[in-house]
Structure formats: C-alpha cells, structure tokens
Amino acid sequence: APDAPIGGCALFPADNIWNARVDGLPVHSNSAAYVASIGSSTGLHPDFGAGLWNGHPIGIPYTTTRSSQSTPVPTITFTYADESDAGPYYIPADAPIEGGSDAHVLVVDTDTCTLYELFAASPGPGGAWTAGSGAIFDLRSNALRPAGWTSADAAGLPILPGLARYDEVQAALAPGGLGYIPHALRFTVQTSQRAYIWPARHYASSNTSASVPPMGARFRLKSSFDISRFTPQARVILRTLQLYGMIVADNGADWFIGGAPDPGWDNDDLHNLGSVSGANFEAVDESGLMVDPNSGQTRSLTPGPSPTQGVGSVTATATRTATATRS
C-alpha cells in the first residue's frame, strides 16, 4: 500500500517496507524493555500541525520540482561528505527549510520520481548550498543506502515516506476512505542503541544496552487499544499505528511522530494523541519480511484479523495496494 503519490510519484514500490502492514507480525522479544526505555507513561506527541511555532511551520516541510525545467544546485558542501550522495541535487532556491537545528530540506523531482533530502541545510550565494549530509533516493526502487551510511536522518532512512501528510488523512476520512494512512510513520527516541536493524543503515549512539531500541526498530499500537473515542485526525493516526506502526528514525524527544506542516491540521484534534501512553505500544519483529538485507522489498505476509473499531472493515495482505486521492 504505497503513500498517496506526490506529483504522480508513489513513495517507493508497493512492496517496500514503509508500505508494509505489521499488525500480523510477532512481538519483538525486547519489546517491554524498549517501551520502558522510551517511556511507558510518556504520551505520543505529533511533531506537526497547523500554524507557526517560533516563527516556523510545525513539522518537516517538503516541496516538488521538475528537473526538466530547472538546473541542479551548482555546488553543495557536506559536513559528512563521505556518507552523502554526490549529486547532482535539484533543490529549488526557495525550498522550505525545517525550523530548528535539524533544518531538513525534502524535495521530490516529479519528472524522475527522485527524492532529495538534506540535513542541516543552508542556502548560500550563487545558488550553492551547505548541509550536514545529503541523500538521494529513487522512489521507484527498493534499494537501501550503503550499509553504515547516514542520510538526512540518523537511521540512514528517507524522511518523506515516514511523514504524516494532511492530504493522506483527508483521503482517509473521505467517504469510502481507508480510515488510515497506508504506510509507517517515523518517530524519535531520546536514547537509542549503538546498532541498527533492517531497514535502517546507520546508528548515532554510544549506548550498547540491549534494553534500548536500535535505529530501525518498529513499533505498533496494540490492537486492543480502543481508538473509537478519538477525534477524526487523531483516530486516523492511531489506526495507522495499529496497522503500519512507526520506525525509530532519529534521536530526539521520546514518542515524537513526524509529519508535514499543513494549515488543514486541527491542532486541538491532534493534541488528543498525547493521552496515548507508551505502554499501549509494542515493538515488532519484522525480520521475517526481509527479502534481501540491502533492499527495502518485503515478502508478502497475511496478517491476522484486526478490529475495525469504527473505521471500516480492513482485510489485506501486508502489501495491500491502496489508492488515495490528493486534494
């Protein structure tokens, strides 16, 4: 079930790990320890919304470009050049930059379905850019980054496919909509392990404790959690977390879920996610989905029955194809 397309580009093939359901997977043997380390009593936090926070949109913004009608960035200087893709990068001069120290820039070239992502990005004179790191992803491919390489995220994963986007929630809530976003979300933890597991490619920690999650660890909201009492936007996010879960993608505040800013978000609605504590989550073992350690492709597994909880009947394989319309 791929993301709602952006400019006609699906965010990775339908059988990519980001687009795989995990409601039928076994619980990870270290699940209880992982959850305790992140915070059993700590609530979820949507790190996205409408309006501004400290003068910047709330969330990680993205934009599109057309390489056939533009020129690549003339020079781009990376702090971590040895783990960054050389380019060329098609980054519009006015590309939105995430507020705060991460300063992510995400751009989809809709001509080639290529995703460009920068970390700690800053435009310079003459169209040049500087950045901490940069990663280029072919959205039509399941290829992962080289083992051990970072990306614009500490886990070496793409950011954009893990963001909650308002257009997807709107499609989920429309008549005949799915009731959920058909892909995993990205989230952060304050303390991660000095390790990464598939599909992650990089770690950013000195902590060797097996009780804290490695980069790439995947969590899901327990199927027994009643989402029916929640407001619409929060309910879609929670149903998504039951079916597709979320991936540890970076170090940051505990249980912070990534999303793109949009004036359509209802911040009061999303705020209700804070009442969902970590104790309602479990880590899953998704190693059985792996086809090749260097690929994000998944083998098809049929999950067990899942409660509908007022969002419509949901029966599918792990790689169900779903179509969502962009507003």
Predicted regions and their residues:
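Short, surface-exposed polybasic-aromatic patches that bind anionic ligands, especially phosphate groups
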Residues: 1-310
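Extracellular mucin-like PTS domains
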Residues: 312-327
